[in-house]
């Protein structure tokens, strides 16, 4: 029997340019390590790393002719099948580098898009990734058909200025892709409408929404599982969760909330993805509370927290109340940093350490006066029972001399049934 054929993995050389003019897009040792982890997530293996310091990028080759020759030799020596840059490349730079290096060339954006395409499971997630891919592909189409344009068509005998099949195909592809982009945007607009309807229903029922945000692989899905008993896959790999998952969580005797797990953020997150995932990420704008999960065991946790903070601001969610959840505290040595404060909670989502305190903090931050009360309705006021079923959480109803009801009621309901609730006293600000 023949041995099972091993899966063929791309051998990848990573290239990064560190330049002051690139600012946040500049490559560092830390960002190159993260790029290597992204390659692993995508199913490849890192065969080598080249990090160059240069005052300004070369307009044609990004890293300069000399460095290109060095990378080409490196690729040949290690037998690499792909080169991935930690920076964003222009379509023309990517095309030139592919020709000079003789292997496929991607930039960080293209790699992340590939990972997202592998990970998206729901229709909504796939639509959003497809939109981002088409927007990334559109300016790169010219390179795909340049060989036909140079030939002047398949025969190579077209007259100067003639419109060969290569150019025709380019225009056709552009029209097709723009048409697909319009269709996907229309589909995503329908997703937005559905989400808006769901939000209105939650607001009508006064169910608070808690959104879990954080850097990729910080432990967001593990926290959702720990809080709600859900069975969301939570693996130790980047971008394991792309599709928003929402679960109902009972925080206390008087409060239920909807908890949503969102796509993880990362440094240099492609703007195409931020734009494409707005249908999902805009849920943050309507959350009542954000849980910013931070992997405190990661040496780069402060920088990762800053990346998330900037994206929260970009998405218009910076005014929403927030609890910083310092996760993986079980991996921090005794005596090392374990932050505490009014808006900080140290936990281990894996073991459950600190989660009870987190629930208490959520309860306090979202407490809007909801109370569990016993109501004694006279039978001639039975119509109020229908209102309670609509606007409160009725737990039990018994019929005796009165209609005896146990319900969890928001403040506006308490104001309507206060005369029949002997164990509830309105707050002083409501007294006349």
Language model regions located:
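Canonical P-loop GTPase G-domain recognition
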Residues: 100-158, 165, 318-324, 328-379, ...
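Conserved beta-strand segments of the P-loop GTPase G domain that flank and frequently precede/overlap
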Residues: 14-18, 49-52, 84-86, 292-295, ...
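Conserved nucleotide-binding/hydrolysis micro-motifs of P-loop NTPases
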Residues: 18-22, 54-56, 88-91, 110-113, ...
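N-terminal accessory targeting/assembly segments
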Residues: 1-113, 425-426, 430-432
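Conserved G1/Walker A P-loop phosphate-binding module
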Residues: 4-10, 149-289
């Amino acid at each position: 029997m023949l041995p099972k054929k091993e899966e063929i993995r791309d051998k990848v050389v990573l290239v990064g340019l560190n330049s002051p003019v690139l600012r946040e897009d500049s490559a560092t040792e830390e960002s190159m390590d993260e790029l290597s982890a992204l390659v692993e997530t995508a199913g490849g293996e890192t065969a080598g790393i080249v990090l160059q310091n240069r005052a300004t990028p070369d307009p044609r080759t990004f890293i300069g002719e000399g460095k290109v020759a060095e990378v080409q030799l490196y690729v040949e020596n290690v037998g690499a099948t792909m080169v991935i840059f930690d920076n964003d490349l222009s379509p023309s730079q990517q095309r030139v580098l592919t020709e000079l290096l003789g292997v496929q060339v991607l930039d960080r954006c293209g790699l992340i898009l590939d990972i997202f395409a592998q990970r998206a499971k729901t229709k909504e997630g796939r639509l959003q990734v497809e939109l981002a891919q088409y927007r990334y592909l559109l300016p790169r189409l010219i390179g795909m058909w340049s060989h036909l344009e140079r030939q002047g068509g398949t025969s190579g005998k077209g007259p100067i200025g003639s419109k060969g099949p290569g150019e025709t195909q380019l225009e056709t592809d552009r029209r097709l892709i723009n048409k697909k982009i319009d269709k996907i945007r229309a589909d995503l607009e329908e997703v937005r409408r559905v989400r808006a309807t769901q939000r209105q229903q939650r607001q009508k029922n006064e169910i608070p929404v808690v959104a879990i945000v954080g850097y990729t692989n910080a432990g967001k899905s593990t926290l959702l599982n720990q809080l709600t008993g859900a069975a969301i896959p939570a693996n130790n790999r980047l971008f394991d969760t792309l599709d928003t998952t929402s679960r109902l969580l009972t925080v206390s005797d008087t409060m239920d909330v909807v908890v949503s797990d969102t796509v993880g953020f990362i440094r240099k997150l492609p703007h195409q993805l931020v734009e494409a995932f707005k249908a999902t990420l805009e849920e943050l704008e309507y959350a009542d509370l954000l849980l910013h999960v931070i992997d405190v065991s990661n040496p780069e946790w402060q920088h990762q927290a800053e990346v998330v903070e900037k994206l929260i601001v970009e998405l218009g969610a910076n005014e929403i109340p927030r609890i910083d959840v310092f996760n993986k505290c079980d991996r921090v040595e005794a005596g090392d940093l374990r932050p505490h404060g009014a808006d900080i909670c140290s936990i281990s989502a894996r073991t459950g350490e600190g989660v009870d305190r987190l629930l208490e903090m959520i309860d306090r931050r979202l407490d809007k006066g909801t109370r569990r009360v016993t109501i004694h309705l006279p039978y001639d006021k039975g119509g109020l029972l229908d209102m309670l079923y609509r606007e409160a959480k009725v737990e039990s109803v018994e019929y005796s001399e009165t209609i005896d009801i146990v319900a969890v009621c928001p403040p506006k309901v308490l104001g309507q049934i206060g005369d029949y609730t002997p164990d509830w006293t309105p707050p002083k600000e409501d007294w006349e």
